[in-house]
């Protein structure tokens, strides 16, 4: 039986370089072997990868550049293509396709871009293609940067509704003291709640090659666990670490979820103001409530209010009962045009399409 579970795995620069000044191909080959094993077992995988700047520096033979943002962006621009080619060639050994996505904070904070990014990720995963994600360092300014791939990976985990997020690093996990200064430091195996004490012992930044230290990993774990995603900080150089984590072995530091994924989503939908009303027929009501199906345009009989794609709306029966809250894939103007029509007619009517459904079941809470 295949496993239906979504994992986001973040690889830091130190993990991919193994402490050197370039990508460590033998180590990356072993990483891909593990990911291929999980992919073939049915896990839905998303990679968040660092390493573009290190790859660019090596490709350009370690040029002497001033320590400016422009220099880093130059290295990222050159190195990103080298980095993605490396992932692509290694996955090709196992006949697995990957898809590159470069994100900035603006892509996540803007509703339309957020939905587009989410839909792209879903499409890749639904077609057994592994998304490989990095921040778009070559063009991002400080105002639109997420800032580090730890926090980016947490946001990506929310985008794809992952069950788990793995932050792989050059450390064994979170220790009660800095193990580089205190040889007797003890590994903290489980963190039930991220407190000020946990943040304090996380300390500052990590290696010089990357931008993320233990403190950014704690920040990422906080974001993810509040959204119902279990997060684990684990050593990227441990043999078979990804496979072992996926099958439940205790490695590194595990951060327990702070809220159930569905409950977290329910609270958000309940709290959001309703921007409009979609009235549905009896067939759509039965499909949604009894069969847990998405809402199709064919089942819509009326659309009230003006709303954008992704705003929260009430879904109401013809008897006037509110039965669900949802985030439609189309704005109110588009829904007016396609209501009552078959899904295959959407593109012909609108000139574009965001999928066959009006409101996806994953974006809907039944009341």
UniProtKB/Swiss-Prot annotation:
Its domain of life? Bacteria
A GO cellular component term found in this entry reads: cytosol
Q: Where is the signal peptide?
A: none
Single GO biological process annotation from the record: L-proline biosynthetic process
Where, in this chain's numbering, is substrate bound?
Answer: 50, 137, 149
The record lists the catalysed reaction(s) as: L-glutamate + ATP = L-glutamyl 5-phosphate + ADP
Q: What Gene Ontology molecular-function terms does this entry list?
A: ATP binding; glutamate 5-kinase activity; RNA binding
- Give the disulfide map: none
Reported EC number(s) for this entry are 2.7.2.11
Q: Where in the cell is it found?
A: Cytoplasm
Q: In which pathway does it act?
A: Amino-acid biosynthesis; L-proline biosynthesis; L-glutamate 5-semialdehyde from L-glutamate: step 1/2
PUA domain: from which residue to which, for each copy?
A: 275-353
Question: What protein family does this chain belong to?
Answer: Belongs to the glutamate 5-kinase family.
Q: Which PANTHER family does the UniProt record give?
A: GLUTAMATE 5-KINASE (PTHR43654), ISOPENTENYL PHOSPHATE KINASE (PTHR43654:SF1)
Q: What does this protein do?
A: Catalyzes the transfer of a phosphate group to glutamate to form L-glutamate 5-phosphate.
Protein name per UniProt:
Glutamate 5-kinase
**Gene name of the record:** proB
